[in-house]
């Protein structure tokens, strides 16, 4: 007789510890039911991982599942698993019916990540019970302290439960109690207990593996040969002895008055199930944990290899009741040897939870990889060429993130991922895309279109302006919608030229400020509100203004008072630099006619790709962040962003995100945007390159230079976007990456402790102007016909010692010579930001880079104060700063105050410079006199000469 089939006569059911789609679909499960009498199936994450990762049989189902819309990795896996469980349950249903619900079950496990969360375990188990919708389902719940109350609750709801990760006799007693109490509650609520089944899954071979290891240690240390023999005799005996004693406990628990009362109502006993019965020690019989654990009302769930082995040479007998006294003696002997079985089983539960979580990580990684393959055109591609040293560091850090569940904890808003301060209060951006009200944006967009505005102007700074600027530059003017402009400057020329570029009578203004207290958008609003009032009348002016702000801000009050057309509210838990995928970016996008439904749909693909269920090696945002952070720790802290022509403005947004998030506490990453790519010889060993382009922008020359950098040992990340419509994916990728990099660096990426310092200085200066009508006097260290030079006493002394004297060139030469390996030079120009000035600053910076071999920044103030200014003041002291100010050819008054735009800009420049010098930065200010174009040309030539 078939030995497997013979187990039926001894009261034991055989379940199969294996499941795969083809295995069920091809009739193999049905064959085992018919030939071997298999009466159930168990599954776990490891089983599913092997099935999905090691074959292509799930490729088509994954593709079909995603045809109806993208799914998160966990959702996608669950859909596959539920289908597999349903199919297996249907095959086993005749067994279930024939045996009146005593057998014929398929087990599906709740997420191992929930093993220490009672409420979440209950919620998931109840949901899976409903999703599968089969009476012969058993939901697997671990026998952790948090799992026990969940078991009782679920049994009390009439859900059949397979209790897993059971090692200890004591815990088994608690498991049985949870089952009995749950049955009593179910009965009391009017339920029929005959519909409920449960098994208590004792993990067997893992006990021997753990105990044998400790016995081997004892044997190695023992000197007495008799003691060595006694200890050796215990090897391979403990797991079976423990199981036999548990079975004796089972017989006691499921007898007597309490059980009789439940049984009379149709309750079934909670059978002991022997799990982990594949033999791990090759010195033991491959059917040891089957042959020695045969008994009435038990289940043995076996892997296919063990099933085949038992069918081939197994022998069935009533072994579970044999040698009970010997089993007691074996356990007693172990205790006398100084080995605590209780301690071992407690540790095995902890290890089991971790092993199951590890298996789930591998499973979700496999599903994520398959999903990415199916969606290949829908998700922007990323490749990392990091070199050996950095690559190993990223791999090690990634493994730490996986083991410590930091991705899930990040999404759960666990501040301990970072510094444990207030990070949990600033993570609303994680879900802002999913919560976007597309219908409302679409309705608003249509109202804008009907009003035939010629222009739309965003008045904002930092996160309120840079994201909209990227969108405006990337998408351009859309047919039927206004042209989107951004104003983020107090420079009078920039304000005037913006005004000249629009038709003020047919322009809508978006005043964007989270706090409502930011100086620049407030004075810009005051200026343009007055201009609109002049153009269309004061009573109608408010109808041309919108506000985007946080609830309760001062801007909300002003907007209400002045009759703004609408107020859009942001989420107070989203910081400005993370707000582009919230109303601060989406309102300007909608105003400009960008297809938000498409933008959000495409962005959500990246959100899901970076989700809590995607392990580090398959998570693009986390991978980028780990690489950025690890590179920073290795001294490669100059994150050099290379953006192709179609997305050329992306770096302006990314540099704020990176600098303001990481540049603090004396450390951080310094973003380098807009530097023209060159040969390896001009770069130091502090670079980390990120290259972004759309896939239709071929540039062989650029690619050749990138390859040369890679071959020279520089880390290079390549990101290829499907099209500009995927820009939202890059916003989210970089947000996740920056948050992760902050954690790797050990800083809080959501505060900006040094930004306020410059604001305070500026307010002090403008307050003085309001009182006296002039800014406090300042004395240059050198004054020439074309420029004045300013710095503090410490910098002046150092520069004079280095050769600075009475001419501009000597000061520039001494100042730029202070830059060395690992430094960067930042040009901070408080002038109009236009193409000509951008080109001139570019000439200056490239000359510095090529001669000094240092990273360079070219920034315009006051714009950069809300962007990279945080890193310049609070980050590493590796910056050499050249501030450029100039006489304004004209000025513009700000309605309602003495200080003009020019005065405010001057105060901002002075406040910024004062804070830089107070922080001990190497800083020099050059104030150009007279005509700005001539002054910039002179300065450019002076810099070129100073470098030679």
Model-derived regions, located:
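N- or domain-start disorder-to-order transition segments that initiate the globular core
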Residues: 1-27, 397
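Conserved, mostly hydrophobic/aromatic
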Residues: 44, 108, 139, 154, ...
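Active-site beta->alpha loop and helix N-cap motifs at the rims of alpha/beta catalytic domains
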Residues: 47-150
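Catalytic alpha/beta core domains of metabolic enzymes, predominantly
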Residues: 159-305
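Flexible, acidic glycine-rich loops studded with aromatic residues
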Residues: 267-371
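Extended, charge-enriched "interface" segments that sit outside catalytic cores
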Residues: 376-450, 728-730, 741-744, 770-815, ...
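Glycine-rich phosphate-binding loops that contact phosphosugars or nucleotide phosphates
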Residues: 446-614, 688, 692-695, 704-711, ...
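Active-site phosphate/pyrophosphate-binding segments
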Residues: 534-689, 698-699, 736-850
């Amino acid at each position: 007789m078939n030995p497997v089939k013979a187990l039926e006569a001894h009261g034991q059911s055989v379940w199969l510890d294996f499941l795969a789609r083809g295995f069920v679909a091809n009739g193999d499960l049905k064959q085992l039911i018919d030939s071997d009498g298999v009466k159930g199936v168990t599954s776990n994450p490891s089983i599913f991982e092997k099935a999905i990762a090691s074959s292509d049989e799930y490729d088509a189902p994954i593709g079909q599942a995603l045809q109806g819309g993208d799914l998160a990795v966990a959702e996608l896996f669950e859909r596959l698993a539920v289908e597999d469980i349903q199919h297996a349950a249907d095959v086993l249903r005749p067994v279930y019916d024939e045996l009146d619900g005593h057998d014929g079950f398929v087990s599906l496990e709740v997420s191992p990540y929930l093993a220490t969360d009672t409420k979440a375990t209950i919620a998931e188990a109840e949901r899976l019970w409903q999703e599968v919708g089969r009476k012969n389902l058993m939901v697997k719940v671990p026998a952790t302290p948090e799992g026990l109350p969940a078991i009782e609750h679920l049994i009390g709801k009439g859900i059949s439960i397979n209790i897993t990760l059971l090692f200890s006799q004591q815990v088994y007693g608690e498991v049985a109690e949870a089952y009995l109490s749950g049955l009593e509650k179910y009965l009391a609520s009017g339920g029929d207990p005959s519909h409920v089944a449960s098994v208590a899954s004792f993990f067997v071979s893992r006990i021997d593996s753990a105990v044998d290891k400790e016995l081997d240690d004892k044997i190695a240390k023992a000197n007495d040969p008799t003691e060595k023999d006694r200890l050796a005799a215990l090897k391979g005996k403990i797991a079976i002895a423990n199981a036999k004693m548990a079975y004796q406990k089972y017989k006691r628990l499921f007898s007597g008055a309490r059980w009789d009362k439940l049984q009379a109502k149709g309750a079934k006993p909670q059978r002991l199930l022997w799990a982990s019965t594949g033999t791990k020690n090759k010195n033991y019989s491959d059917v040891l944990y089957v042959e020695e654990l045969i008994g009435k009302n038990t289940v043995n769930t076996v892997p296919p290899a063990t099933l085949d082995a038992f069918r081939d040479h197994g022998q069935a007998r009533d072994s579970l009741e044999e040698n009970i006294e010997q089993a007691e003696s074996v356990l007693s002997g172990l205790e006398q040897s100084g080995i605590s079985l209780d301690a071992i089983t407690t540790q095995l539960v902890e290890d089991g939870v971790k092993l199951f979580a590890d298996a789930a990580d591998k499973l979700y990684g496999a599903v994520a990889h398959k999903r990415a393959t199916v969606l290949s055109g829908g998700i922007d591609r990323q490749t990392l060429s990091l070199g050996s040293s950095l690559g190993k560091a990223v791999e090690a850090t990634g493994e730490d993130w996986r083991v410590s569940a930091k991705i899930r904890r990040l999404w759960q808003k666990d501040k301990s991922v970072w510094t444990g301060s207030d990070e949990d209060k600033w993570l609303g951006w994680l879900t802002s895309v999913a919560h976007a009200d597309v219908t409302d944006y679409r309705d608003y967009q249509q109202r804008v279109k009907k009003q035939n505005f010629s222009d739309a102007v965003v008045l904002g700074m930092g996160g309120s302006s840079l994201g909209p600027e990227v969108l405006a530059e990337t998408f351009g003017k859309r047919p039927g919608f206004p042209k989107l402009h951004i104003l983020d400057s107090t420079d009078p020329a920039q304000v005037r030229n913006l005004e000249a570029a629009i038709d003020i009578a047919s322009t809508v203004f978006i005043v964007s400020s989270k706090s409502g207290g930011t100086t620049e958008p407030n004075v810009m609003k005051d200026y343009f509100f007055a201009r609109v009032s002049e153009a269309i009348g004061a009573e109608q002016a408010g109808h041309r203004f919108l506000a985007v702000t946080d609830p309760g801000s001062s801007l909300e009050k002003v907007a209400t008072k002045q009759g703004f057309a609408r107020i859009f509210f942001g989420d107070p838990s989203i910081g400005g630099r993370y707000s582009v995928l919230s109303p601060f970016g989406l309102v300007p996008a909608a105003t400009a006619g960008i297809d938000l439904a498409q933008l959000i749909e495409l962005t959500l693909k990246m959100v899901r790709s970076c989700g809590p269920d995607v392990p580090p090696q398959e998570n693009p945002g986390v991978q980028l962040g780990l690489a950025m952070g690890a590179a920073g720790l290795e001294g490669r802290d100059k994150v050099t962003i290379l953006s192709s022509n179609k997305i050329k403005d992306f770096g302006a947004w990314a540099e704020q995100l990176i600098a303001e998030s990481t540049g603090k506490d004396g450390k951080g990453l310094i973003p380098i945007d807009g530097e023209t790519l060159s040969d390896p010889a001009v770069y130091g060993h502090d670079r980390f390159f990120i290259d972004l382009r759309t896939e239709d922008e071929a540039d062989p020359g650029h690619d050749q230079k990138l390859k040369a950098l890679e071959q020279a040992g520089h880390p290079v990340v390549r990101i290829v976007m499907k099209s500009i419509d995927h820009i939202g994916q890059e916003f989210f990728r970089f947000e996740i990456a920056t948050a992760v990099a902050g954690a790797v660096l050990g800083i809080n990426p959501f505060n900006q402790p040094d930004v306020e310092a410059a604001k305070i200085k500026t307010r002090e200066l403008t307050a003085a102007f309001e009182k006296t009508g002039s800014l406090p006097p300042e004395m240059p260290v050198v004054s020439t016909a074309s420029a004045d030079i300013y710095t503090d006493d410490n910098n002046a002394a150092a520069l004079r010692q280095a050769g600075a004297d009475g001419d501009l060139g000597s000061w520039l030469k001494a100042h730029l010579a202070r830059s060395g390996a690992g430094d960067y030079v930042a040009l901070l120009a408080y002038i109009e930001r236009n193409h000509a000035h951008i080109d001139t600053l570019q000439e200056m910076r490239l000359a510095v880079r090529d001669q000094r071999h240092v990273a360079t920044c070219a920034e315009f103030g006051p714009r950069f104060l809300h962007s990279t200014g945080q890193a310049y003041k609070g980050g590493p002291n590796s910056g050499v700063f050249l501030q450029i100010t100039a006489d304004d050819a004209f000025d513009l008054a700000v309605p309602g105050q003495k200080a003009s735009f020019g005065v405010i800009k001057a105060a901002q420049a002075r406040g910024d410079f004062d804070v830089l010098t107070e922080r001990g930065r190497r800083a020099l200010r050059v104030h150009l006199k007279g005509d700005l174009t001539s002054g910039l040309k002179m300065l450019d030539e002076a810099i070129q000469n100073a470098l030679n």
